[in-house]
Amino acid sequence: MEKLGINWGLLIAQLINVIFVVWLLTTFLYRPILNMLNQRTSRIQEGLQDAEKVKEQLANAKRDYDAELAKARQEAAAILAQAQERARAQAAEIIAQAHRDAEKIKSDALAQAEQERLRMLGELKDRMAELVVLTAERVLGEELKTNHDRLIEESLAELGKYN
């Protein structure tokens, strides 16, 4: 190979140098860079997984929040409906009580009017009896006896039938 201009000693030295440089580059440059790239890829994958977990947790939290909000709205609507029903019942009770009070006042007034009417009728009967006695005394000229009291009472009873 010397005819071709190849120097075996130099070729072997260069081959050893190339192998040594490849070994040096592989050991000190390629593997650390490859390890660094692998670590970075791992961190990126972990970050993506963490982001996905956070996204799922956020979706779950939103779903829970929406469920709680819907439940709270239903409870609020139920409480409002109960309050409205109680208010209607109280209003009906107040109106019924007012009607009962009005009826009692009316019946008391009617009873009082009836008592007043009876009292006035009694006074009228007494006054009429006095007038009858006075008229009879003047007509007869003397005071009526007790046996005539019965006649007066009967006359008044007859007058009471017409009232």
Curated annotation (Swiss-Prot):
UniProt keywords, alphabetically: ATP synthesis, Cell membrane, CF(0), Hydrogen ion transport, Ion transport, Membrane, Transmembrane, Transmembrane helix, Transport
Entry's Gene Ontology molecular function annotations: proton-transporting ATP synthase activity, rotational mechanism; proton-transporting ATPase activity, rotational mechanism
Residues spanning the membrane: 9-29
GTP-binding among keywords: no
Signal sequence interval, chain numbering: none
Chief localization: membrane
Cell location: Cell membrane
Keyword Transport: yes
Superkingdom of the organism of origin: Bacteria
Annotated membrane topology: Single-pass membrane protein
One protein family per Pfam: ATP-synt_B
One Gene Ontology cellular component: proton-transporting ATP synthase complex
Subunit structure and binding partners: F-type ATPases have 2 components, F(1) - the catalytic core - and F(0) - the membrane proton channel. F(1) has five subunits: alpha(3), beta(3), gamma(1), delta(1), epsilon(1). F(0) has four main subunits: a(1), b(2) and c(10-14). The alpha and beta chains form an alternating ring which encloses part of the gamma chain. F(1) is attached to F(0) by a central stalk formed by the gamma and epsilon chains, while a peripheral stalk is formed by the delta and b chains.
Family: Belongs to the ATPase B chain family.
Biological role: F(1)F(0) ATP synthase produces ATP from ADP in the presence of a proton or sodium gradient. F-type ATPases consist of two structural domains, F(1) containing the extramembraneous catalytic core and F(0) containing the membrane proton channel, linked together by a central stalk and a peripheral stalk. During catalysis, ATP synthesis in the catalytic domain of F(1) is coupled via a rotary mechanism of the central stalk subunits to proton translocation. Component of the F(0) channel, it forms part of the peripheral stalk, linking F(1) to F(0).
Family annotation (HAMAP family): ATP_synth_b_bprime
NCBIfam families the UniProt entry points to: ATP_synt_b, PRK14473.1
Protein name per its UniProtKB record: ATP synthase subunit b
Species for this entry: Roseiflexus sp. (strain RS-1)
Record gene name: atpF
